[in-house]
Every structure is written in C-alpha cells, then in structure tokens.
Regions:
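A cross-kingdom marker of C-terminal helix-rich interaction/assembly modules
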Residues: 1-50, 56, 60-61, 66, ...
Length: 185
C-alpha cells in the first residue's frame, strides 16, 4: 500500500503520543490488508468487523492527535479499556472543522461509516436463508466496505504526517483519496 510506504519513509520521535498513533496506524494498515484478503477470498462478514476496527482506530487516532492532553495519553497507556465517548468524538470533529480534506471525506462517507460502527445486531436485516444461509452482501456493499476501510487509513495517515510536519507527504496521501467515488449502498 502506497500509504504504508510513505509513512514508513520517515523516522519519528519516541514521545508517547507519536508512538501511540504510529502504532495504531500500523495496526490499521494490517487490518486493511486483511480486509482486502478476506474480500478476495469471498469472506465478507469478517471484513466488515475489521472495517469497524479500522473506523474506531481512525476516530481514536484523530482524537489523540487533535484533542488528547498529556494526561489523556498517560491514561490511555495505563488503561486497556479506555474508550472514546461521544463528547470526545464531537471534540475531534470540532478540531478538524476547518480542515477541507477531513470535511470532504466526512461529507461523502459519514453516513456509511456510521453504519459500520453499529452493533452487529443491525446486520440481522441482511441475513438470508435458503440453500446457503448467511449475510447478504452485494458488490456495491463490498466495494463500500473496502473503500471505507481504505479512506480511514488514508485520512489518519495524512493527519499523522501533517501533525509530524511532513506536509508534502501529507498532501500526497490526501491526493490518493480524490479518485474514490461516494458510497453506493
């Protein structure tokens, strides 16, 4: 993935915030690769679950970059159960309120991304029975899942590089998102 190549081309300071977000981004890139492999293998349900993890990673990473205090960073490091609250997500959205790249993606993908973060019970409406029971995924839904996962990685990578003052590479990563169409499903 081009994003991984660009992000990995730099060395970063070893402060906790940077290490946390860089590690989160590395995990998201691995999840993204897994999503693509699962979809290529026809195993779409688990790809949805991994996409949910990628979305949560995006929100968490953007919040850490834009809103977390040093005390928050320390609490996150100490508390394995640390969760973002709706207020924290709102604060993160406010922090990026003037960022055109963030709001362009948010405008096109926010509704779809919100669908992927709901509890699994919501998926019951997509179950079918017959010769082979399971969740119903058409091509448009599969494309939307993989695109959402990709754009989350792209967005966090761009904002991480911007935070690290690698502005040229941040803009280069932002351009990768330009050709992705809006969601279909």
């Amino acid at each position: 993935m081009e994003v991984d190549r660009i992000v990995s081309s730099h060395t970063y300071p070893d402060d906790k915030r940077t290490v946390m977000v860089r590690g989160l981004l590395a995990a998201m890139i691995q999840y993204h690769r897994s999503v693509l492999l699962l979809v290529q293998s026809g195993i779409v349900g688990p790809a949805n679950s991994l996409t949910r993890n990628i979305i949560n990673g995006l929100r968490f990473g953007l919040w850490v970059i834009s809103c977390a205090t040093q005390e928050h960073v320390h609490r996150i490091e100490e508390d394995e159960e640390f969760q973002l609250t709706p207020e924290m997500i709102k604060d993160m959205h406010s922090a990026y309120s003037t960022d055109p790249f963030f709001y362009k993606l948010k405008g096109r993908w926010d509704t779809q991304i919100s669908k992927y973060t709901r509890e699994r019970i919501i998926e019951l409406g997509r179950w079918h029975t017959g010769l082979s029971a399971g969740l119903d995924f058409d091509e448009a839904k599969i494309r939307d899942v993989t695109t959402a996962a990709t754009l989350c990685v792209v967005l966090l990578a761009a904002k991480f590089l911007e935070y690290q003052k690698h502005l040229t590479d941040s803009k280069q990563i932002e351009t990768l998102a330009e050709d992705y169409p809006p969601p279909v499903s």
